[in-house]
UniProtKB/Swiss-Prot annotation:
GO terms for molecular function: GTP binding; ribosome binding. HAMAP family: GTPase_Der. The keyword Repeat applies. This is GTPase Der. Associates with the 50S ribosomal subunit. It comes from Rhodopirellula baltica (strain DSM 10527 / NCIMB 13988 / SH1). Keywords: GTP-binding, Nucleotide-binding, Repeat, Ribosome biogenesis. Belongs to the TRAFAC class TrmE-Era-EngA-EngB-Septin-like GTPase superfamily. EngA (Der) GTPase family. InterPro entries: G_ENGA (IPR031166), GTP-bd (IPR006073), GTPase_Der (IPR016484), KH_dom-like (IPR032859), KH_dom-like_a/b (IPR015946), P-loop_NTPase (IPR027417), Small_GTP-bd (IPR005225). GO terms for biological process: ribosome biogenesis. The lineage of its organism: Bacteria, Pseudomonadati, Planctomycetota, Planctomycetia, Pirellulales. Residues 4-168, 178-352 form the EngA-type G domain. GTP 2 binds at residues 184-191, 231-235, 296-299. Pfam families: KH_dom-like (PF14714), MMR_HSR1 (PF01926). GTP 1 binds at residues 10-17, 57-61, 120-123.
């Protein structure tokens, strides 16, 4: 039995996205007074007393989209309604019953799943009585809530759970999914890629740049591996960020990178890299995320152009990420899409790898023998030992006589050596140089300690 789905529907600006965030207890959807902010279906998993359901946020019914995507938005809403086990019909107590509310109810005619009429913005108890006029709609159990004043959240959750399909004893929490952030400039094919992965029209795909405004999570499975793909808003030059939505989108893309286990950095095979690409790659590096450079739309490139040309170009543009794998795909047809995801799973495994202190020091000793550190103030700095202290990213602490004596170039050399000889070949490695403690120094003077180059 699949995880039950609960869809949030209603006219624009009744607080659907606020309700979504409130029930999820975290800010996932963009909340703004501008009509039509939500276009794609957003989902999150909710748990209550061992009962799981997937909550779906949808666009406002009846809004005319400024980018001529109205029919696509409607299709996304219809798909959410069709897949839902329970429907939350959201109305606004403060504005009262509107003709568009009645149109929404008309759209639900013939839908046989349970409907819960959620009267939002009842910020004070005395406003609850104003919700009675919505009973004229004749659909579902009526409950008043306020997302801003945190009124009746638990009651609403219980009403939802009571109307879910009878629980299957075999239904367990979905296994932890590997999170993949899909980032890049606008219109490079990120949403098409997600649709290919999910094998459904999950995202609105259009030639209108900036179609995806939220970061949207899509769960799917490949060869027994569960993934959670996060499709992010496309970024553009900072001086071009003209609206609050673009500001939110930039923030969403950055947060998606922070959430991710692996990042897929998308490029358009027909366009050169830009300042935006470099800023985004810099953000990925800053957060030490494993990354695959994905060159999309490869089918549109002249067949005589070798992939090596793009490889050389990207290596030149992003010299500090020379270890990052590069993939060439056609998201629209699915060419190499599965291979990219399998490679992402390999990177995730590398980032989770842990090596013993003995093996790490054996590798480090070989690096020092091959290339000892340079003299510093008349002395050669000593490296005593190293230990891996964490994963994701693999993090190594090197105990030495003086961290200042080991230059950044030498530290990069050690990282490169570890990458070549340990199971961290294609992922970032964090390296910390730390001065030995007084007790360790005393042990060395007494003959009980030794450096790796001894």
């Amino acid at each position: 039995m699949p995880v039950p789905q609960v869809a949030i529907v209603g006219r624009p600006n009744v607080g659907k996205s606020s309700l979504f965030n409130w029930l999820a207890r975290r800010r996932l959807a963009i909340v703004d007074n501008f009509e039509g902010v939500t276009r794609d279906r957003m989902t999150t998993l909710i748990e209550s007393d061992d009962q799981f359901f997937e909550l779906i946020d949808t666009g406002g019914m009846g809004v005319e989209d400024a980018d001529d995507l109205t029919s696509d938005v409607r299709r996304q809403i219809d798909m959410a309604i069709a897949s839902a086990d329970v429907i939350l019909l959201v109305v606004d107590v403060q504005t009262g019953l509107m003709p568009l509310d009645e149109e929404v109810v008309e759209r639900l005619r013939g839908v046989e799943r349970p409907v819960i009429l959620v009267a939002n913005k009842a910020d004070q108890e005395h406003q609850d009585i104003h919700a009675d006029e919505f009973r004229r709609l004749g659909r579902g159990h009526l409950i008043t809530v306020s997302t801003t004043q945190n009124r009746h959240r638990d009651d609403l959750i219980q009403v939802i759970v009571d109307r879910l399909p009878e629980k299957d004893e075999d239904l367990v929490a979905p296994e932890s999914s590997m999170k993949i952030a899909i980032v890049g400039r606008r219109n490079v094919g990120k949403s098409t890629f997600v649709n290919t992965l999910a094998e459904s029209d999950r995202m609105i795909v259009s030639e209108v740049a900036g179609t995806t405004r939220d970061s949207v999570d899509v769960r799917f499975e490949i060869d027994g591996q569960t993934f959670l793909a996060i499709d992010t808003p496309g970024l553009r030059k900072r001086k071009s960020i003209r609206t609050d939505l673009d500001f939110y989108g930039t923030h969403r893309a950055q947060r998606s990178v922070r959430r991710a286990d692996v990042v897929l950095m998308f490029f358009d095979a027909l366009e050169k890299t830009s300042k935006v690409d470099k800023q985004l790659v810099g953000y990925i590096m800053e957060h030490h995320k494993p990354v695959i450079f994905v060159v999309n739309k490869w089918d549109k490139v002249d067949k005589e152009v070798p992939t090596e040309r793009w490889v050389k170009y990207l290596r030149h543009q992003f010299t500090t990420l020379s270890y990052a794998p590069i993939a060439f795909i056609t998201g629209q047809t699915g060419r190499n899409v599965k291979a990219v995801m399998n490679h992402a799973a390999m990177l995730y495994k590398q980032a989770q790898s842990r090596v013993s202190t003995g093996e790490l020091n054996r590798i480090l000793r070989a690096a020092i023998e091959q290339h000892p550190p340079a003299m510093y103030q008349g002395r050669r700095p000593k490296i005593f030992y190293a230990t891996q202290v964490s994963t994701e990213p693999p993090t190594v602490v090197v105990m030495c006589s003086d961290p200042k004596a080991l230059t950044h170039d030498y530290q990069r050399y050690l990282i490169g050596w570890m990458r070549d000889h340990l199971p961290f070949g294609e992922v970032p490695i964090k390296l910390y140089m730390q001065q030995r403690s007084r007790s360790e120094a005393k042990a060395e003077r007494s003959g009980q300690g030794r450096s790796l180059e001894s």
